[in-house]
Amino acid sequence: MKSNKKSNHLRAIYRALVIAIGLAVIIVFNYFNRKNNNARSSRRACSCFFSLTGVNLEKIGSFDTGAKLIVLNHQSLLDIIYLEAYHPSNICWIAKKELGEIPFYGHALTDTGMILIDREDKKGIVSLLKACKEKLDQNRPLVIFPEGTRGKGGEKFLPFKQGAKIIAEKFQLKIQPMVLINSIKIFNSKPLEAYKARTRLVMLESYTPDFSSPTWYEELQERMQKEYLKHYHELNA
C-alpha cells in the first residue's frame, strides 16, 4: 500500500514537471506567435503531455467546428490541456480573472486573447457578453465549465451556474456538450496525486436548444450527467 502511494506521488511529481516545463515553453512561443491566430499552433503543443507521460486519452465522438459554445465538466488542470491539444479550432476559454493575474501562468490566457471574468463585479455580465460577441465575431468557439470550479471527479457534477445559459440564450448558440472522465485521476494538484487510470473525452452531438423552453438548461445538465455516469462506471468498474 505504501509502495503504491509513493508510486502515485512520484508519478504526480513527474507529470507536474512535464506540465510546468511544457507550459513555460508554450508561453514563450505564444508570446512571439500571439498575432497568428492567437498562437493556436503553439498551443497545440499541449499534445506533447500525452507522449511524454504515456497517458492515452480515449476520444469518443468528434469535434463539431460549427458549434459556437462548448460546455464540459471540470475536474483537473488537464481538462484545458485535453482540448487545447486536440480541438481543431481557435477556441476561446472563459476563465476567472484571478487566473490571469497569476505570475507567468497568466500569460497563457492574456497573450492568447482568452476571456477573463470578474465574479465580484456586478456589471461583469455586461463585460462578459461584450467579450463573447467580440470572440464570436472572430469565429472563435467559446469554451466554458458550467460548474464554475473543479469538481471532485466522483459520480455527480456540481450544480451548473447560469453563465453558460446566459451566453447561449443571448447569442442563440449551437452547443456541443462534452464530458471528461478520470482526468482528476491522471493528475490532481490538490492533493498532488496521479494514478494509472483510463481517461476519456466524450464529444456529444451538437444541437441548438429550444431557448423558449424554461427547462432547456436543466435538460442539458441531465444529458451530460447521464452520459458521464455511463462512461464513469465503465472506466471505474
UniProtKB/Swiss-Prot annotation:
Enzyme nomenclature, EC number: 2.3.1.51
Key words, A-Z: Acyltransferase, Cell inner membrane, Cell membrane, Lipid biosynthesis, Lipid metabolism, Membrane, Phospholipid biosynthesis, Phospholipid metabolism, Transferase
Gene assigned in the entry: plsC
Subcellular location: Cell inner membrane
Cellular component per GO, a single term: plasma membrane
Protein name: 1-acyl-sn-glycerol-3-phosphate acyltransferase
Pathway, per record: Phospholipid metabolism; CDP-diacylglycerol biosynthesis; CDP-diacylglycerol from sn-glycerol 3-phosphate: step 2/3
TM ranges: none
Motif HXXXXD motif: where in chain: 74-79
Catalytic activity from the UniProt record: a 1-acyl-sn-glycero-3-phosphate + an acyl-CoA = a 1,2-diacyl-sn-glycero-3-phosphate + CoA
Organism of this sequence: Helicobacter pylori (strain J99 / ATCC 700824) (Campylobacter pylori J99)
Membrane-related topology note: Peripheral membrane protein
Domain of life: Bacteria
